[in-house]
A protein has these predicted regions:
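Alpha/beta-hydrolase active-site loop
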Residues: 60-81, 100
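Glycine-rich nucleophile elbow surrounding the catalytic serine of serine-hydrolase chemistry
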Residues: 90-100
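Gly/Ser-rich "nucleophile elbow"/oxyanion-hole loop immediately N-terminal to the catalytic nucleophile
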Residues: 71-92, 106-109
Length: 203
C-alpha cells in the first residue's frame, strides 16, 4: 500500500491507496484517531479500499468542520477518481463529525460505521451524565466550549450534538453499522449509542 501525507484546506491529511482498487474505487474515511485500532481499516485496504483522514480534531462537529469535510470529499473524488459516496468511520469523538456530516449531506455518504460513538457533548467531554459513570475530560470540555461558543450555562441548550440528528439519519436511510462495548467510561453506552438504538427503533 502507498501512504501519502499532505496539506489541504489548511489541514493535515492522509490517504492510503490499496495495492489494487475495488472496481468502484471505494474508500473509507476515518473521521478521527487515524491509527487507533486499525483492524477494520487494514482489512478494507486488503480488500481494495482506499483509506483517508483529514485533521479536524478539537472542532467537535461544528459547522466549520462539516464544511471542511464537504470540501475535502469533493477534492478527493475529483483528484483521485474515488467513488462519489464515502463510507465514514466515526470512532469515539469521531462520531461528532461523522454523524453531523452525514445528517447535513446524506447524498455524500454511502455507509456510516460508528464504533463506541460520542453523540452528546454533555456526556463527553462535559461528563455531566454521571449516573452512568461517564467521567468527562475537563481540559477537552474547555476546548469544546470555546470552539462552540458555549458557557456552562448555555451548553445545556446546545442542539448541535449528534444525538439531535438521529431522525435525519434515519430519514436518509443510509446503512448504519454500530459497534459498542458496555464498559466505556468515557462515552457511556446509555448516554450515547443507546440513544441511537432506541430512536432508530422508534423511527
Amino acid at each position: 500500500c502507498d501512504r501519502y501525507d499532505f496539506k489541504v484546506l489548511g489541514k493535515n491529511a492522509i490517504i492510503v491507496f490499496p495495492k489494487k482498487f475495488t472496481p468502484k474505487n471505494k474508500w473509507v474515511w476515518r473521521a478521527e484517531f487515524f491509527d487507533a485500532f486499525p483492524i477494520v481499516d487494514l482489512d478494507l485496504l486488503e480488500q481494495g479500499w482506499a483509506l483517508t483522514y483529514i485533521g479536524i480534531s478539537d472542532m467537535y462537529g461544528n459547522d466549520e468542520s462539516v464544511e471542511i469535510m464537504r470540501q475535502y470529499q469533493e477534492f478527493l473524488v475529483n483528484a483521485f477518481d474515488l467513488e462519489p459516496k464515502a463510507t465514514i468511520f466515526g470512532f469515539s469523538r469521531g462520531a461528532f463529525y461523522a454523524v453531523n456530516y452525514t445528517a447535513k449531506y446524506p447524498q455524500n455518504v454511502g455507509c456510516l460505521y460508528l464504533d463506541a460513538p460520542g453523540l452528546d457533548i454533555l456526556s463527553w467531554p462535559a461528563g455531566r451524565g454521571k449516573s452512568f459513570g461517564g467521567q468527562g475530560t475537563p481540559a477537552d470540555w474547555e476546548i469544546c466550549k470555546n470552539v462552540l461558543g458555549l458557557t456552562e450555562e448555555t451548553a445545556a441548550d446546545y442542539k448541535g450534538s449528534p444525538k439531535f440528528h438521529i431522525a435525519e439519519l434515519a430519514k436518509a436511510d443510509i446503512p448504519l453499522i454500530l459497534v459498542q462495548g458496555d464498559a466505556d467510561i468515557a462515552a457511556p453506552m446509555e448516554e450515547n449509542a443507546q440513544l441511537l438504538i432506541d430512536n432508530y427503533e422508534k423511527l
